[in-house]
A protein has these predicted regions:
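Flavin-dependent oxidoreductase catalytic cores
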Residues: 1-328
Length: 328
């Protein structure tokens, strides 16, 4: 049965690309869409940055028809600023406005934004209510289980967020205190999904790195779909691999070296076009190890790629990879 976020049909058991800072930009989103992602989210955008018209924030508003349905994700700690940012985002006509209540990094959380708001649930609910009231676009939330082990209130929080009008919730199976350490705990995500009061889609997130893992959480916890973050970095093929496995119970063959090099090269070129050579090359570095994961004796080439400082240099290294690893 198709899942709907408000009036947006996102298909049966949709796969969502997580909003990731300096990762979920248009070049990477285009690849993920090509390889099977159903719903895109922008990198998270500072509400204050949007209001100030800061270039770093406004550039993240760039969305394209080819990647729809797409959500623009915002974060902040002031209700008035978040409402104003929502109005700015609405001009770009995204299908979804997503609120980040999950970012655990200190510079965000210590200001009471992102996962920081998990220490002030009444404010979280009030902020969400005001954002929902300020737009006709479906509003969704991405959050965590709680601030720490003693404040895992996600079952109640999800109900209250639904009551003020959100149209879907994505839950990362860790607390803010955990950051990304340890294993994601999906049991509470399952409790939210199986709470008879919950009527909106519940998407799970955390440690989704294989088709087998997706099948496990789908069957065990009944989630409406999954949001994939780190598992997609440098590996956009994961979306089609998951879809194929859920449909056939068979694993797709991993991309060969030519496919990996071709997609990596395209990703690099689009990143440079979009962000300029220096930034494009710098932000590609986090992708290289995953593009060429599990290839023996690759360390030398990976080191060369992450230390390269020009497009021509990286492209020459990729040519060498294609030549020297043609059997993979």
């Amino acid at each position: 049965m198709s899942v709907k976020i408000g009036n947006i049909d996102v298909g049966d058991f949709p796969l969502l690309l997580a909003p990731m800072e300096d990762v979920s930009d248009p070049p990477f989103r285009a690849l993920c869409k090509e390889y099977g992602a159903d719903v895109m989210y922008t990198e998270f955008i500072s509400s204050e940055g949007l209001i100030r018209d800061a270039v770093k924030s406004t550039q993240k508003l760039d969305i394209y028809d080819s990647e729809r349905p797409i959500g623009i994700q915002i974060f902040g700690n002031e209700i008035s600023s978040m409402k104003q940012a929502t109005e700015i985002c609405a001009r770009e006509k995204p299908e979804i406005i997503d609120i980040n209540y999950g970012c655990p990094v200190k510079k965000v959380a210590n200001k009471g934004a992102g996962a920081g708001i998990l220490k002030d649930i009444p404010k979280m609910i009030s902020m969400t209510k005001e954002i929902v009231k300020s737009t006709d676009i479906p509003v969704t939330v991405k959050t965590r289980l709680g601030w720490d082990e003693h404040t895992k209130y996600i079952v109640e929080v999800a109900e209250r967020l639904q009551d003020v009008g959100i149209k879907a919730i994505s839950i990362h199976g860790r607390t803010r205190k955990q950051m990304y350490k340890g294993e994601a705990d999906w049991t509470l995500i399952g409790e939210v999904k199986n709470n008879p009061r919950m009527k909106i889609p519940v998407f799970g997130n955390g440690d989704i790195d294989s088709p087998q893992k997706v099948k496990e959480v789908k069957n065990k916890y009944g989630v409406d779909g999954v949001m994939i973050g780190r598992g997609a970095i440098g590996y956009p093929w994961i979306f089609n691999e998951i879809k194929h496995f859920l449909k056939t119970n068979e694993l797709l063959k991993k991309p060969n070296i030519k496919e990996r090099v071709d997609v990596c090269r395209r990703h690099l070129k689009h990143s440079i076009i979009w962000k300029g050579e220096m930034t494009g090359i710098a932000e590609m570095k986090r992708h290289y190890s995953s593009y060429f994961k599990a290839i023996p004796n690759f360390k030398e080439y990976r080191t060369k790629m992450v230390t390269a400082n020009s497009e021509d240099e990286v492209l020459r290294i990729l040519d060498d990879v294609l030549l020297n690893f043609s059997n993979y």
